[in-house]
Amino acid sequence: MALPRSAVSAEALAVVTNRLNGNGLRQDLRLIAALIEPHTRVLDVGCADGALLAHLARTKGVDARGIELSPTGVHECVSQGLAVVQGDGDTDLAIYPDDSFDYVILSQTIQAMRQPHLVLENMLRIGRFGIVSFTNYAYWRARWYLLRRGRMPMARCLPDPWYSTANIHPCTLEDFEHLCTELGLRIEQRSCLSADGTPSRLASSRWLDNLFSEQAVFVLSRPARRPADRRSGRAAARPARPLPAPAAPPHRPAPDPS
C-alpha cells in the first residue's frame, strides 16, 4: 500500500478525472478516491453529506467511517447507512487509538480547524496515511484581487466574504509544506489543481505551484516511530533534558582543636 513519493503527473490526473467523471463527486474527491486502496480502513474528518465515504464503500469495499460537525450532514450520512458520528475534528481525534486507520482524510476542512497543527499530528497518529486537500490563498488571482481592491480575496474557490467564511486559518502551499516540515511529517505526494479540480497546467516548480494552483491534494505519512515513543493523543515524546548536577556543599573550615 506504499505510495510513490513524486507528485502525480498531469496526464495521470487527467486519466483519473476521465475514469471517475460522472460519479457526482467533486473533482478533488475523485482524486482522493483514486488514492485509496481497496478493503482498507478509512476515516473522513468533516465528511459533510458522506458522498466520498459512500463512493469508497460502494466501489472499493473499504471500512468507511466519518466525523461530521453538522447535524444535517450526520443525518444525511446515517440515512445512507454510513457509520458517521457527530463530532469535532479539533478535539475528537484524540480519543482514537494509535494506528486505527489506513487513511485519514481531511478534504477542504483544515482551514476551518482551530488548531490545524494538532489535527495533522492526530491524523498521522491514528492513520498510516493522511490525505489533505485545501484552497491555496497564494493563487495569483487572489493576490491580484487583494493588491487591486485592497480587500480579502473572493474567487471561484473562495466564494464567501471574510465575515461569513468558515476558513479561519487560510494557508498557502508553501505554508502547508513548512508546517509539515515543522511537524516532521513526510509528503508522499502533492497534486496541484485548478478550482474545478482539473490539473494545474502552469505548475511545474514549487514557486509556480504556489502561484498558479487554486487548490492542492497532499498525501502525508509519518516517520517510523519506536513503540516507546507512542503516546495516545500526543506527539512523540521529546528526549528529556539532562538534570543539572547538584551544587557542591559550601566548604566549612574544620573546628580548632584548641
Where do the PLM segments sit?
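Class I SAM-dependent methyltransferase Rossmann-like catalytic core
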Residues: 10-25
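Class I SAM-dependent methyltransferase SAM/SAH-binding core
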Residues: 51, 55-92
